[in-house]
Structure formats: structure tokens, C-alpha cells
UniProtKB/Swiss-Prot annotation:
Its main location: virion. Residues 231-334 are annotated as: Dimerization. InterPro entries: N_prot_C_CoV, N_prot_N_CoV, NCAP_aCoV, Nucleocap_CoV, Nucleocapsid_C, Nucleocapsid_N. Residues 17-27, 164-176 have a biased composition (Basic residues). The lineage of its organism: Viruses, Riboviria, Orthornavirae, Pisuviricota, Pisoniviricetes. Residues 1-29, 150-240, 329-358 are annotated as: Disordered. Belongs to the alphacoronavirus nucleocapsid protein family. One of its GO terms (molecular function) is RNA binding. This is Nucleoprotein. The keyword RNA-binding applies. It comes from Porcine transmissible gastroenteritis coronavirus (strain FS772/70) (TGEV).
Length: 382
């Protein structure tokens, strides 16, 4: 029966022209959110020529529901009043969901590319779309991903918002700086007149200021708290790494203490990536209740050994940083070379950021994957 749907079979397909038509699309300001992170397409490439016909992300739905479409999102940024085109992003939606929820499988729509796994049912799924408070999922596929496709990773919405607010604050500061300078001149003349009047009355303002400063320093010194870890008279396994060389407490790097490159060992908790590395370490309760423990006598002490296995997400940048620290002492030249590469990439990224300084009030782009904040144009142009 037609309303029951049919199994998808690509056996009769001979072309890759999918999801293109001559009709004009409409702008939409209320686009449902995709379950997955988007794909950013390399500029100059055509998504429909590169996308495999079974290019359905893994992780949601049953076998019958592995069917849907990729929806194009055109983007731009305003730079000094000029529109600067940005690479397209493509979001995946299951059949019967998203901005084209009423479309049938293989309907010709601008900015839409239909995909399905062999054996999926060509009827609307009941999977819906992502809630605004839920994070989008990382893209994973069974087959090979075209080189022109960049699979995006999650970025913090709070970070994006804070960058926008920071730009706004910076602009406000620059606008008010001129007013402040003119006001300061008036304030200086008033201050000079007051000081002259006090001097005539025999009040020594300089000595009073000096006494006030000395009292402030005394108060600040008394409130300063020493944050250096107290490691004296503690067992090695109870010590805490502070700022500075950790070999004082844990010894030089070796086969039995093989974590940390020269920078991390020399700087301890003040090393640049220490907070990210610490996030990859299990908690005390995980070690206590999720480890295999053994013990044996060692003279007048007991030697305790535990084995703990856990998994880190492969696509998390912190995981790569963490893995580079394992056995780093045994390959110092390789580690130094990799660190130079990272610094070079970081400087290149900073330069590219400085080249484009968008106006936060007219910017129509966000690096947080929220489709509702970006203009959608369904028309495909060659």
C-alpha cells in the first residue's frame, strides 16, 4: 500500500542529480534544528556531485528510518559594509522532519540532496528534530567521507555569545573614549583648584595620600593567601603538583612514570594545557570503584597496584593533547616538532581572525550550529 511506504533500492539509479530544480526557494527564519553537526563544504565544490547516495549519519533511528535529506545553508559576513560569502553548510534531516517535512522522497527541491540506506522505508519517519537545549551530535558514517567535506565539531554557545558581547563592549568603549578625554580635562582643572585651596588651609594632601597607600598595601598583603600545595611530610601518592618543576615530588620521567613532556614537567599546574589534560583523568570515585586492585608486602610497607581502563572520545581535541603526553620523554625531538606545528597553526588562525573584523550588529553568521540565526536561501546557483 502507498501509505505504508516502500523499501529504498538504488539499483536502478544511474545519475547523481538529486535535489535540484528551477523553482525559487523562500527565506526561512524558523528552521527546525538538526540532530547532527553540519558539514562545511569546500568553496567551489558542489555538494550534490560529491555526496554518496547512502550518506546517512549513524546513531539515530532503526534500519527502516535511515532515510532523509541534506539541506543547504548559505552564509555570509558583513566586512566594512561589504558582503563576504562564507562556505556553505549542510544539515541532515530525516524524511518527514526539518524544513521540508512535507516533501516526499526524491522531490526536486533547491538546496536539498536526498540520501537513504538500501532497505530503508521511503515513508516519513517519526524521529522529529533536535530540541533547542540539546547539543548536536558528531557526524559518523559507514563509508568514506569526501575530502571536500569538513565535519564540524561542537563549539560552546556561551563562548560564541561572549565573543559577540566582547565586540559590543569594545565598540562602546571606543565611542565613549572621546567623551571621557574631554571630561578629564575639566576634572583636572577642578582638582587643581581644590588642591590649591586645601594647601592654603594648611592641609598636606601628599602625606595623606602616602599614608593611605601604605595602609592599603598592608591590608592587601595580609589578605594574600598562599596557594602553594603543602606537600611536606606527605606520601608521594598524596602530593599535589603546583606551579613549577614536578620532578621534586614525582621524579624524572621513566617507564614507570611516563606522562608529560618537558614543558608540562617543568611548569606543573601552570603549564598551558594542564586544565585540559586534567579533564581527561578519571575522578577519585571512578578509580576507587572502577579499578582492579592488588596488594603485596614490600618490606615494612604494602605495595598497592591498581589497573583502570576508560575511554576518551576520539574526536575531542583534548584527547589528542592527552595522548601526546604519553611517553613524551622518550621522543623529545618528535614532541618539539609537533609543538612547533601547533604554534604555527595557532598563529595562522589568529592572523586570519584579525583580517575579518565583523560588526556584531549586522553580522549574519554564527559558529554555533543554530540554523535559526543564519539566512537560508534555497536557490542553487552554478
Amino acid at each position: 500500500m502507498a501509505n505504508q511506504g516502500q523499501r529504498v533500492s538504488w539499483g536502478d539509479e544511474s545519475t547523481k542529480i538529486r535535489g535540484r530544480s528551477n523553482s525559487r526557494g523562500r527565506k526561512s527564519n524558523n528552521i527546525p534544528l538538526s540532530f547532527f553537526n553540519p558539514i562545511t563544504l569546500q568553496q567551489g565544490s558542489k555538494f550534490w556531485n560529491l555526496c554518496p547516495r547512502d550518506f546517512v549519519p549513524k546513531g539515530i533511528g532503526n534500519r527502516d528510518q535511515q532515510i532523509g535529506y541534506w539541506n543547504r545553508q548559505t552564509r555570509y559576513r558583513m566586512v566594512k559594509g561589504q558582503r563576504k560569502e562564507l562556505p556553505e553548510r549542510w544539515f541532515f534531516y530525516y524524511l518527514g522532519t526539518g524544513p521540508h517535512a512535507d516533501a516526499k522522497f526524491k522531490d526536486k527541491l533547491d538546496g536539498v540532496v536526498w540520501v537513504a540506506k538500501d532497505g530503508a522505508m521511503n515513508k516519513p519517519t517519526t524521529l522529529g528534530s533536535r530540541g533547542a537545549n540539546n547539543e548536536s551530535k558528531a557526524l559518523k558514517f559507514d563509508g568514506k567521507v569526501p575530502g571536500e567535506f569538513q565535519l564540524e565539531v561542537n563549539q560552546s554557545r556561551d563562548n560564541s555569545r561572549s565573543r559577540s558581547q566582547s565586540r559590543s563592549r569594545s565598540r562602546n568603549r571606543s565611542q565613549s573614549r572621546g567623551r571621557q578625554q574631554s571630561n578629564n580635562k575639566k576634572d583636572d582643572s577642578v582638582e587643581q583648584a581644590v588642591l590649591a585651596a586645601l594647601k592654603k588651609l594648611g592641609v598636606d594632601t601628599e602625606k595623606q595620600q602616602q599614608r593611605s597607600c601604605s595602609k592599603s598595601k598592608e591590608r592587601s598583603n595580609s589578605k594574600t593567601r598562599d596557594t602553594t600545595p603543602k606537600n611536606e611530610n606527605k606520601h608521594t601518592w598524596k602530593r599535589t603538583a603546583g606551579k613549577g618543576d614536578v620532578t621534586r615530588f614525582y621524579g624524572a620521567r621513566s617507564s614507570s612514570a611516563n606522562f608529560g613532556d618537558s614543558d608540562l614537567v617543568a611548569n606543573g599546574s601552570s603549564a598551558k594545557h594542564y586544565p585540559q589534560l586534567a579533564e581527561c583523568v578519571p575522578s577519585v570515585s571512578s578509580i576507587l570503584f572502577g579499578s582492579y586492585w592488588t596488594s603485596k608486602e614490600d618490606g615494612d610497607q604494602i605495595e598497592v597496584t591498581f589497573t583502570h581502563k576508560y575511554h576518551l572520545p576520539k574526536d575531542d581535541p583534548k584527547t589528542e593533547q592527552f595522548l601526546q603526553q604519553i611517553n613524551a620523554y622518550a621522543r623529545p625531538s618528535e614532541v618539539a616538532k609537533e609543538q612547533r606545528k601547533r604554534k604555527s597553526r595557532s598563529k595562522s588562525a589568529e592572523r586570519s581572525e584579525q583580517e575579518v573584523v565583523p560588526d556584531a550588529l549586522i553580522e549574519n553568521y554564527t559558529d554555533v550550529f543554530d540554523d535559526t540565526q543564519v539566512e537560508m536561501i534555497d536557490e542553487v546557483t552554478n
